[in-house]
Amino acid sequence: MTQRKTDVEAYVLSRDLQGIASALSPFLGCVQLELDPEMQAHIWLSDQVRVIVQDSADCFVSVWVIGQFPWSSDIEFARLLASQLQCTVRCDPNAEHPQTGPCTFLEISAAQEQLIEWSEDQAV
C-alpha cells in the first residue's frame, strides 16, 4: 500500500498571490494568504491544511501545501497550478521520473513538459 504524501510543493513563475489563492480555494476551502514577516512568507492555515507561499530561486515562488489535500504528487499539483495560472511551473519529478538527480525538475508550461537542470546559481 502506498503511503499518502503529507506535503506537495511546486515553484510558480508568478507573483500573483490572489491568483494562487484562487487556484487553490476550490480544493482547500477559501484560501486567504496573509503575510508572516517572521517567516518572510504568505501563509494560510485551516484545521486540515497549511499553505506557505515564499520567494524562491530566480523569479519563482514556492507554493507548499502541508496536510490533507487532493493531489497525489508534486507533479499533479504543479499541473493544476500551471493550468489554472497559465504560467510556467516547476516541481520535483520523482513521482514519474525516479531516476533523476537532485537538480532535475519537471518544467510545465502551456506548450510542453520537460525535464530541466535547475539550481540556485542558474538564471531563468
Q: What role is predicted for each listed range?
A:
Residues 1-25, 32:
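Short, extreme N-terminal segment that most often corresponds to the first beta-strand
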Residues 36-61:
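An N-terminal amphipathic alpha-helical segment
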Residues 16-22, 47, 72-74:
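Short low-complexity stretches enriched in small and charged residues
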Residues 5, 9, 48, 74, ...:
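Sparse, context-dependent recognition of short Cys/His-centered cofactor- or disulfide-binding micro-motifs
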Residues 23-30, 50-52, 68:
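A broad, low-specificity signal for short, low-complexity segments enriched in glycine/proline
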Residues 25-40, 88-89, 113-117:
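Short secondary-structure junctions
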Residues 53-124:
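Charged interaction segments
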